[in-house]
Amino acid sequence: MASWTSPWWVLIGMVFMHSPLPQTTAEKSPGAYFLPEFALSPQGSFLEDTTGEQFLTYRYDDQTSRNTRSDEDKDGNWDAWGDWSDCSRTCGGGASYSLRRCLTGRNCEGQNIRYKTCSNHDCPPDAEDFRAQQCSAYNDVQYQGHYYEWLPRYNDPAAPCALKCHAQGQNLVVELAPKVLDGTRCNTDSLDMCISGICQAVGCDRQLGSNAKEDNCGVCAGDGSTCRLVRGQSKSHVSPEKREENVIAVPLGSRSVRITVKGPAHLFIESKTLQGSKGEHSFNSPGVFLVENTTVEFQRGSERQTFKIPGPLMADFIFKTRYTAAKDSVVQFFFYQPISHQWRQTDFFPCTVTCGGGYQLNSAECVDIRLKRVVPDHYCHYYPENVKPKPKLKECSMDPCPSSDGFKEIMPYDHFQPLPRWEHNPWTACSVSCGGGIQRRSFVCVEESMHGEILQVEEWKCMYAPKPKVMQTCNLFDCPKWIAMEWSQCTVTCGRGLRYRVVLCINHRGEHVGGCNPQLKLHIKEECVIPIPCYKPKEKSPVEAKLPWLKQAQELEETRIATEEPTFIPEPWSACSTTCGPGVQVREVKCRVLLTFTQTETELPEEECEGPKLPTERPCLLEACDESPASRELDIPLPEDSETTYDWEYAGFTPCTATCVGGHQEAIAVCLHIQTQQTVNDSLCDMVHRPPAMSQACNTEPCPPRWHVGSWGPCSATCGVGIQTRDVYCLHPGETPAPPEECRDEKPHALQACNQFDCPPGWHIEEWQQCSRTCGGGTQNRRVTCRQLLTDGSFLNLSDELCQGPKASSHKSCARTDCPPHLAVGDWSKCSVSCGVGIQRRKQVCQRLAAKGRRIPLSEMMCRDLPGLPLVRSCQMPECSKIKSEMKTKLGEQGPQILSVQRVYIQTREEKRINLTIGSRAYLLPNTSVIIKCPVRRFQKSLIQWEKDGRCLQNSKRLGITKSGSLKIHGLAAPDIGVYRCIAGSAQETVVLKLIGTDNRLIARPALREPMREYPGMDHSEANSLGVTWHKMRQMWNNKNDLYLDDDHISNQPFLRALLGHCSNSAGSTNSWELKNKQFEAAVKQGAYSMDTAQFDELIRNMSQLMETGEVSDDLASQLIYQLVAELAKAQPTHMQWRGIQEETPPAAQLRGETGSVSQSSHAKNSGKLTFKPKGPVLMRQSQPPSISFNKTINSRIGNTVYITKRTEVINILCDLITPSEATYTWTKDGTLLQPSVKIILDGTGKIQIQNPTRKEQGIYECSVANHLGSDVESSSVLYAEAPVILSVERNITKPEHNHLSVVVGGIVEAALGANVTIRCPVKGVPQPNITWLKRGGSLSGNVSLLFNGSLLLQNVSLENEGTYVCIATNALGKAVATSVLHLLERRWPESRIVFLQGHKKYILQATNTRTNSNDPTGEPPPQEPFWEPGNWSHCSATCGHLGARIQRPQCVMANGQEVSEALCDHLQKPLAGFEPCNIRDCPARWFTSVWSQCSVSCGEGYHSRQVTCKRTKANGTVQVVSPRACAPKDRPLGRKPCFGHPCVQWEPGNRCPGRCMGRAVRMQQRHTACQHNSSDSNCDDRKRPTLRRNCTSGACDVCWHTGPWKPCTAACGRGFQSRKVDCIHTRSCKPVAKRHCVQKKKPISWRHCLGPSCDRDCTDTTHYCMFVKHLNLCSLDRYKQRCCQSCQEG
């Protein structure tokens, strides 16, 4: 087959072949070869003349490129299909073709070309449209003599595959070519593409001829199961009070969204992206908009708004309505919402075996479609349409297993082996105690081994079976709730009263418990109304028989209002003075006038009102009082001519004496006034004519059954809330029982609450939990808490100190029996080979768990009956041949490598020259010459480059780079301190050089003039910790008595042998130990010592052992270990670490002793590219030593520490980039995002300003900068500066029996001669104060040294160490001083000797527990007498910190060692107990609390508070405050609790100074006091009674009356009055206040009389506005008629 020409040639050919332009213009165009796309049709293709679709075929499923014959060719005349051509496009979907030729000429049936799609991935956003590229190819070709900028013409239905373009800015459309290039889309809204000028169908799967279409969910050829249709409508409830309302939330990924609102409400969108950014989008005009990368079409009509979004949504859209008019709106919504969690099948898990036949499983995992991450399965169970696929199982590794060294591969699985299974743990406790909660359980996948062992395996092995249920509901019963008992009877028998009920907290079993919400408690009291009037409305006589004046009706009087003329205005009538019979009503009548100018009424004297005054009293009768019919018959009519004024009359009956079974009532006679019928005194009536006594029977009906109640029983509780019960029966009058329904009255309560007051705090003890073990010593725990039962039944948890009595034990031992013997195995060893098949071994021991929890090894015979465990198993490593080939391939592909050596090098003697290898960390002496080698692979050594602290190094007099790539430095000095980097292509390694000065401290590197680049993890202002350590080590090595190492004693010093130890495992041979001794000896002779990190770890461990044995003092050993670990455990940078680009080498890798390994840059390993230059933004770091500035404005760069002083007003922290670029800055404080405030000002460009900082502003401020290339972060500490404070303890300490004594400075210390004494000087201050020690009257001795924490160590003290030691702590803010006095005593224990006599023999008891007879020459053994000897050491008193100690108490024993009663040794002097510190190490962080403060108030309700901080107690005794995140949040104690005092003595309420004003700005304030004793006031001392009144200053009393101008006279002529406004105002603000504030001052008059012109004067107009009065028809009013007399008369 002929080879095809390059794409640009083909494109040029097509342009000239199909262009209608003249050939003369072709020479001006060099061709469109710049286009990345090209035509498919080959040169001279026979398809040029065939445009019919019948000549085309496509096989989109055939992706092969092999030259083979097609199986579909039946006639066999076709040759094999050729290779696929290059794709016509590089992105966006193109076409590729394949050709075949007919072997017999043109007699073959079928097509000779086929097509397929290719490059189906989307083009980048900035790529130009393919059709536009083809049009722009003609921009350099003249058309009709002119050049045009051609733009594509899309969606031509007549010729979709013709290249039609229109000239920009012209109304000119031209078909520039009959065919577009293959792969061009036919239309912009479909995937169909043009091939050879014909539009061919393309499905959503991007395949030719495919009919696949996207379903409603956007899934190609999907079934619509990944989304659900959401449709409906809702009514928008917006109003002037509720301006906005959420209508519907449409989540990210939704499609075919259509939201329509019908009505006046305005519809808008609130968006929220996955990154958390929010936005509001409102549109007023229709159009197509882009919202969060989502196309939104907005349509608007008069009463309709519609949003159409094809989707998918790129953010969450919340559609809201906003109020515009008072009319309801209806919102209709329709969209397809994606199912946010779907199942996805996983890949097959690894085969269960490597050979011999196994199986593989896969599973299904639930995936969050939005976040694209795996989530728990229950998220997918929420959707019913989500059906979890079943796991698939298939065989694997069917090849037979090879044999190796006689061991055959053990097949863990066979057809008879049970498959792995799920096993679950017990259910957890329910999440809630009632109301329905959940409980969970965990499960593991286990399998049974060939030996019957149940082993836990990976979860995927059990995926073939459904997982057990991990969650279930529990405690479904109702929670306790308030239940109200029946209401009591009303407290009154008539009218309005109260009734009560008992409200209890009842659980689902009907028991009275606590736990109900007090705020939801039902009310226990309410008002009640008895529908029986408190009088009996029974008429004494018919209405017709009453006198006329008794038949009065309520007159409807005309309501009077004040007018411009003074008028009598009545007040409302009062109630009738009686409820029955005649009474009186009264009212007030006042003279009032209406002031027109203020429209207010004012009161006038009565003489100002004309006319009669209205009545102020009138009689009333609500109804007649009760009387019997008989009384009316006894009425004696009065003669008409009688002059009698008073007479007797019956006024009803007394109440009936019984309510049933017959009672009686007496008639009541009263003396009445005949005319007024008012009751008067009986003495006014003639006693002779008093009516006779009369009685009548009443309530004669039989009595109904009634409720009978018994007495209340005892209360069920003494406090909190108890219950009392009583018997309630329904009984007939004869005490016979009756059914309860026959008792018509309300049943009395049979239950009531009692003792409703809070109980005192008490211990609440719960049940013991299950023992932690069944044997071998376990523990049982229970909760013991201090609780208080409240009146509502709930419990209040209190602190333990509030409960009286001892607290019960919360734990106890259990299962104190020995466990039976059992077999225990260790861990499997490493595989014996690195490739192929090997073996693993493990050890097995027989042991027993004793009752006290110790594991006791036993003889193997004790476990002989137990089934043995497998001790050997095979292991399969990768095939050796495969590893070798991979290594070769890997080594061949790798770039340069640097062969670094991770070692620590310490120089002890002066040497002229030292050789180092890259990767080391060296501590050298000044003036030493050093050569640093940089061995490399696959790199030319002469091209090696060197850097120091990030700057390139060049050859100089003192520094040079050899041809082999080594670095030479002559005569090391302070400027040479730093980090040196060897760069070999993409590989980098470093070496750290530091210098040890003559004072055995590290020499500080001089400050650089120019800002230098810092490397994370490097502390260039590092303290002289190693110098202190090295000083001690040189003292140890130069001490001739202990540690001196000369040529003869190097191999004989046990201390050095113990220090060096074995750096290999315990299986190392003696030869290796001797070799290391020789290496060590040689190193010391050479004046230096080099060790790898594993050796250094061994050194630390052995030094700890020497400390325990006493060969090295505790303080010295602790100091050395701490300093060496702190110095050498630092992370050593192996390459330039740009944040966000490369990973940091973990420090653990530097402490594993990986010597001689090939090291390479981690970034080079990851990418294999030269990327040590930063790509993303890099912050400028200019490290400065911490210092305090007393300026008002402090400017600092990020990464430095800033101190706040009392003078500080503004702090500016700059966060600049090394290379300015666009980036986003984010600031946080203590991990919390900073927001702008009054004190915090963020400018968004990398600067933060803190104004008027206080202690609240101190913290860690972190600046984070990011852009699309990467990010960087740095932080600064802002601290509040404090002067030093020494936490001294003024107490005397006498410990002559201790070998090691540690005290806090302050007081007097008495120690034994030869002891080691540590005087600690704990100090607080910011910045950390410097500590120095002095001795008064002399200098510090040679055995005195300063420890790293500021403590003073005195070793092997002697008499010359006695004296006063002064600790001085200083920082920039001040100085603090504390002293301790040291006295030395003789040692008491254990060198004490006890002498006792028995008979004529003297015995001496020494600390060695041997007794000698001083007077017996025969050597006769002493009598078997008891004696004192040291006992066992006690447990350490603390698990960490600096206060741990253990005690060795003496015990009385016999000669055979048997312990006896101490009473047998009373005649002997008892030795003092031994004492030594223990567990001196850092404690984990925990919560510390201060003591509770006093109540915040002296009376009433307040609170106690305390400080809660997270601290860590360190081994040196100091307490370090750490971040609260270091402590467990759930264990955080309360910082506040309520407290209640006696009621407060309060000044009466009101303003700040209430009461009556006593003068200018002075008031009288008073309060009430009461004696708090329960009995009476006599128990209080009157002399101490608080004052009841006081004068107080009140601005409210600084007032005065203010008068306004007089208004015109109210009378147009004659006599009238005029008024003015009188206000009470504040003298300072001149604002009106309440008039009661001015009552102490005389009020000016507000009105006065006035006289107008004479009323009989001429009729003239007295105002200029009379013309308007006439036109407005106001002449009918007297006021205007008088003032406009002339005008009104003319009308």
Swiss-Prot record:
PANTHER family: ADAMTS A DISINTEGRIN AND METALLOPROTEASE WITH THROMBOSPONDIN MOTIFS PROTEASE, ADAMTS-LIKE PROTEIN 3. One of its GO terms (cellular component) is extracellular region. The gene is ADAMTSL3. Residues 1655-1691 form the PLAC domain. Expressed in epithelial cells of the colon, fallopian tube, skin, breast, prostate, epididymis, liver, pancreatic islets and bile ducts, as well as by vascular endothelial cells, smooth muscle cells, fibroblasts, cortical and ganglionic neurons and cardiac myocytes. Also expressed by malignant epithelial cells in colon cancer, as well as breast, prostate, renal and skin tumors. Expression is significantly reduced in colon cancer compared to normal colon. Disulfide bonds join 87-118, 91-123, 102-108, 576-620, 580-625, 591-609, 831-875, 835-880, 846-863, 934-982, 1215-1263, 1321-1367. This is ADAMTS-like protein 3. Glycans are attached at residues 293, 681, 797, 915, 927, 1102, 1191, 1292, 1316, 1330, 1343, 1349, 1356, 1432, 1516, 1574, 1591. InterPro entries: ADAMTS/ADAMTS-like, ADAMTS_ADAMTS-like, ADAMTS_CR_3, Ig-like_dom, Ig-like_dom_sf, Ig-like_fold, Ig_I-set, Ig_sub. Glycosylated. Can be O-fucosylated by POFUT2 on a serine or a threonine residue found within the consensus sequence C1-X(2)-(S/T)-C2-G of the TSP type-1 repeat domains where C1 and C2 are the first and second cysteine residue of the repeat, respectively. Fucosylated repeats can then be further glycosylated by the addition of a beta-1,3-glucose residue by the glucosyltransferase, B3GALTL. Fucosylation mediates the efficient secretion of ADAMTS family members. It comes from Homo sapiens (Human). Transmembrane segments: none annotated. CDD domains: Ig. Residues 75-124, 418-468, 478-535, 564-626, 703-760, 763-818, 819-881, 1424-1482, 1483-1545, 1597-1644 form the TSP type-1 domain.
